[in-house]
Curated annotation (Swiss-Prot):
Disulfide links within the chain: C84-C176
A GO CC term assigned to this protein in UniProt: plasma membrane
Protein name: Olfactory receptor 10A2
Cytoplasmic-side positions: 34-41, 108-126, 205-224, 280-301
Alphabetical keyword list: Cell membrane, Disulfide bond, G-protein coupled receptor, Membrane, Olfaction, Receptor, Sensory transduction, Transducer, Transmembrane, Transmembrane helix
Compartments in which it is found: Cell membrane
UniProt topology in membrane: Multi-pass membrane protein
Transmembrane domains' residue ranges: 13-33, 42-62, 87-107, 127-147, 185-204, 225-245, 259-279
Length: 303
């Protein structure tokens, strides 16, 4: 795996850095889940989908970071064949699910801003459950086909995966068979999985922008924009890092550069999402304050 060539001092520093990011990610996303469940003011579709995103980010992080920390701490740079396949499967599953969940969240914002009076009716509990299921489901077939197909090839020669986790391109380099058909499928599949949700997000925000421009008061425009600014920032971070990783020309795509870019959406984005939503969203900040106040009051009541 990836960090074996680095000096021990650098590996120790990376371990402390990634451990801190990992703990912040877990605590931040768990806090979002608990607050949106505990506070009745946040029992709306928007926070239902935010809760799904936090569950997803925790899963995404658990797939990659613990093994990476173990590699840095114990200097054990090996991973089993089954472990590599499992890691790749869940990486694809959570990655695809996040693409579609971000599109679903954009649609939720579109309904909230463009049809505010019908919002509770359109986004009822049954509809939001169906949308959440539709967001999570595509990860299963994509991950199953991609992982099963890739690991059905024979491997020979070097067994070194030049990455910090089992992603498809570095594992594919170890295959000693004709992979042309698989590569076509992988490219087309990646484009579809990334572009379809991206187009849905663009469509939603085009309608949102048009609706905001029609609002007469500046206060109304600011309020409407604030409801979707956090999501827009999260989408931008995720898609920019994803595009730079998988859609750059090969001539500009060195293995070391790809590792750094992969860190942005596998490690940094899951940490930043709860920070963005908590700092830029007054409802979440107020709910956090109420939850902390209730917890302190309950603690004072206990003798």
């Amino acid at each position: 795996m990836s960090f074996s060539s680095l000096p021990t001092e650098i590996q120790s520093l990376l371990f402390l850095t990634f451990l801190t990011i990992y703990l912040v990610t877990l605590m931040g996303n768990c806090l979002i889940i608990l607050v949106t469940l505990a506070d009745p003011m946040l029992h709306s579709p928007m926070y239902f989908f935010l809760r799904n995103l936090s569950f997803l980010e925790i899963g995404f992080n658990l797939v990659i970071v613990p093994k990476m920390l173990g590699t840095l701490l114990a200097q054990d740079t090996t991973i089993s064949f089954l472990g590599c396949a499992t890691q790749m499967y869940f990486f694809f599953f959570f990655g695809v699910a996040e693409c579609f969940l971000l599109a679903t969240m954009a649609y939720d914002r579109y309904v909230a801003i463009c049809s505010p009076l019908h919002y509770p009716v359109i986004m009822n509990q049954r509809t939001r459950a169906k949308l959440a299921a539709a967001s999570w489901f595509p990860g299963f077939p994509v991950a199953t086909v991609q992982t099963t197909w890739l690991f059905s090839f024979p491997f020979c020669g070097t067994n070194k995966v030049n990455h910090f986790f089992c992603d498809s391109p570095p594992v594919l380099r170890l295959v000693c068979a004709d992979t042309a058909l698989f590569e076509i499928y992988a490219i087309v599949g990646t484009i579809l999985v990334v572009m379809i949700p991206c187009l849905l997000i663009l469509c939603s925000y085009t309608h949102i922008a048009a609706a905001i421009l029609k609002i007469p008061s500046a206060k109304g425009k600011n309020k409407a924009f604030s409801t979707c600014s956090s999501h827009l920032l999260v989408v931008s971070l995720f898609y920019i890092s994803l595009s730079l990783t998988y859609f750059r020309p090969k001539s500009n795509n060195s293995p070391e550069g790809k590792k750094l870019l992969s860190l942005s959406y596998t490690v940094m984005t899951p940490m930043l999402n709860p920070i963005i939503y908590s700092l830029r969203n007054n409802e979440v900040k107020n709910a956090l304050s109420r939850t902390v106040s209730k917890a302190l009051a309950l603690r004072n009541c206990i003798p």
